[in-house]
Design a protein with these regions (language model features):
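Structural and coupling elements of P-loop NTPases
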Residues: 1-529
């Protein structure tokens, strides 16, 4: 197959949602329809616990939540699908934000009963900033939930999206009968039996036909016709160019646990979703069809195999082909590296690949060369924009609980921070270490991993901080900046890359500081424009 055809075949996307909206279930069902797994590992209800394929760290298995982004790939209808399954747990946002830098489009999963939740709002706003095409999947229709129109309004208002339904539910919860597929013009009847892999579809192009009454009953038929008429009047018709530009978001309804509505989503997705897109580097726009390879590290995962102390750097290929055993330039370190066993993924199963194309995610064994945001090229000096650190929301001092293991603790903290699990700030005054996370559960994860992977114990103390602000003075030698440093010295720290950070204890402090020191600018992400 030609290089251009290989690029056109690829679809790399992320699935994002609030905890428990059914994201991992949806991921598994997509794999099931893609023929990549024989049966989905039950995400609840199954008597035999198979363990979901995409949750593969020990702590995820124990708690039944996805903690780190895993990469899954399969072929479907001649397309190569790469899914980045992001942690939906409210405490794993940092990793999730970064995953969004590596996807070409996104599917947002929303729980029909809970509607839009705040976690989803944050993630979708990042997608909108980047103009990433979005498809919305409203899940769990076999349960009682909000009215479909109310949900669509909520999605439009809270997420700032402009939606158009491509499928619509017939009834809901107890009365749920199935879905009318607007995109393909057919009806899917719901049987409630998840063992049936593919549900029965009835082709149905003329919604006015009296056949409809026979299939779903008189009242539901009248209601469905009214609803579809309303949809055609109120919502815009689907336009692929608008979708690709990030201005229009199609909505699908279904129940992932019951395999319902998932195939329609997948069929439409492979048809409309974008192939790998060009990406902005700091110097120029890099297009996928360029001959020379360029890629960037968006995630580092330590100890994927507890038996070996290995780290894997996940690299998204942006242009050219990545070949095994060919030397590539590590831009930040300015040295050439060769990779004898680049991995492709299928959750925990890794396979060595000889050649990868734009849109693919490759795992490279790493002995400590990589940090998040690093670039690999064939010699060109460039780095990709948009892999920032966000200000954490929780801050705690980290203390060593076992004096004999100080070295292991330092190494563990270092590696976990490289992975981007949390952020480390070192206070200027006394060099005490503060760990900042996006959610409180992260502290447990760090403690657990330090102990189980590095043999080090730690304890925490609260540290009252509202936000971390990265500091950039207009003139580092000015009297004003010196005064700022003198007054705020207790709250000044350095992040891992030695950038100066001001740990503010309230929104009021931030405002006061900004008005008192106008030439000292404060940023809430570590990547300044």
């Amino acid at each position: 197959m030609s290089f251009l055809k290989e690029i056109q075949r690829r679809r790399t996307f992320g699935i994002i949602s609030h905890p428990d909206a059914g994201k991992t279930t949806l991921t598994e069902k997509l794999l099931l329809f893609g023929g990549a797994i024989q049966e989905a590992g039950a995400v609840k209800n199954n008597k035999i616990k198979k363990g979901a394929t995409s949750d593969f760290m020990e702590i995820e298995r124990q708690r039944g939540i996805s903690v780190s982004t895993s990469v899954l790939a399969f072929n479907y209808k001649g397309k190569k699908i790469n899914i980045l399954d992001t942690p939906g747990h409210k405490d794993f946002a940092e990793d999730t934000f970064r995953t969004l830098t590596a996807v070409d489009s996104v599917i947002v999963v929303i729980d029909v009963a809970k509607g839009v939740e705040e976690q989803t709002e944050k993630l979708v706003s990042v997608c909108r900033m980047r103009h990433i095409p979005i498809i919305v999947f409203i899940n769990k229709l076999d349960r009682e939930g909000k009215d479909a129109f109310d949900l669509m309004d909520e999605v439009e208002q809270k997420l700032g999206l402009n939606v158009t339904p491509l499928s619509f539910p017939i009834g809901m919860g107890y009365d749920f009968q199935g879905i009318y597929n607007i995109w393909e013009q057919n009806i899917n009847l719901f049987s409630g039996d998840s063992r049936k892999n593919i549900e029965d579809t009835i082709a149905f192009s003329d919604i006015e036909s009296p056949e409809l009454e026979k299939i779903i009953g008189e009242k539901p038929a009248v209601k469905l016709r009214d609803e579809l008429e309303l949809i055609s009047e109120v919502y815009p018709a689907f336009d692929r160019d608008q979708y690709l530009a990030g201005n229009l978001q199609p909505i699908f309804f279904g129940s992932a646990l019951n395999n319902f509505g998932v195939r329609e989503l997948l069929d439409c997705f492979v048809e409309i979703a974008p192939a790998p897109r060009a990406k902005e580097s700091e110097t120029r726009l890099v297009k996928p069809e360029e001959e020379k390879m360029a890629g960037f590290v968006f995630k580092i995962h330590a100890n994927m195999d507890p038996k070996h102390r290995d780290r894997l750097a996940f690299v998204k290929i942006v242009s050219g082909t990545f070949e095994r055993n060919k030397p590539y330039m590590h831009v930040r370190l300015n040295k050439n590296l060769k990779f004898s066993s680049p991995n492709a993924f299928f959750a925990e199963k890794k396979e060595i690949v000889d050649i990868s194309y734009p849109g693919d995610i490759v795992g490279l064994h790493d002995t400590g060369n990589f940090k998040i945001g690093d670039t690999l090229t064939e010699g060109e000096i460039m780095s990709f924009k948009g892999i920032p650190s966000f200000s954490p929301e929780h801050f705690r001092y980290i203390n060593n609980a076992d004096p004999l293991k100080a070295k292991q603790l330092d190494k563990g903290i270092d590696q976990l921070m490289d992975e981007g699990v949390a952020q480390l700030f070192t206070l200027e005054m006394n060099n005490r270490k503060i760990i900042g996370t996006v959610g409180a559960l992260q502290y447990e994860v760090i403690q657990y991993r330090l102990e189980h992977e590095y043999g080090a114990k730690c304890s925490y103390e609260n540290f009252p901080v509202h936000k971390a602000c990265w500091v950039k003075p207009k003139d580092a030698k000015s009297e004003e900046f010196k005064e700022f440093k003198r007054i705020k010295q207790k709250f000044l720290a350095h992040d891992k890359y030695d950038q100066l950070v001001f740990l503010a204890d309230s929104e009021f402090t931030i405002q006061m500081t900004q008005s008192k020191f106008p030439t000292v600018t404060l940023f809430f992400t570590s990547e300044f424009e």
